[in-house]
A protein has these predicted regions:
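Short, charged/polar N-terminal "headpieces" of proteins
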Residues: 1-24
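Context-gated lysine
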Residues: 3, 29, 37-39, 59, ...
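Well-ordered alpha/beta subsegment
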Residues: 52-85
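A short, structured beta-strand/loop element
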Residues: 17-58
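Alpha-helical structural elements
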Residues: 10-12, 47, 74
């Protein structure tokens, strides 16, 4: 379970699953509260997919969207290196 390295958001765990499927995405979890998938090569409407638990706050979703926008190229490079090995 390789960690997303190009950015960090306090209190969130961000990672890739090795040998995961397209489209490029990573998982984000707030321990004991929720987990979502963040699709970073897709349009905004399809960016977040709830996995379990409560819905993340608007503030958290905005932080993730900003991080993805800033680090999209690095996320794609990490996806290729860690997932499509």
């Amino acid at each position: 379970m390789p960690k997303v390295e190009c950015f960090e958001i306090p209190s969130l765990h961000c990672w890739f699953w090795s040998n995961d499927h397209d489209p490029p995405h990573f998982h984000v979890k707030r321990e004991g509260e929720w987990e979502i998938k963040v699709k970073f090569a897709e349009g905004e409407e399809e960016m977040f997919e709830q996995q379990w638990g409560d819905t993340p706050s608007g503030k958290v979703l905005r932080q993730l969207k900003k991080a993805v926008t800033r680090h999209r190229a690095a996320l794609l490079a990490e996806w290729e290196a860690k997932v499509n090995q």
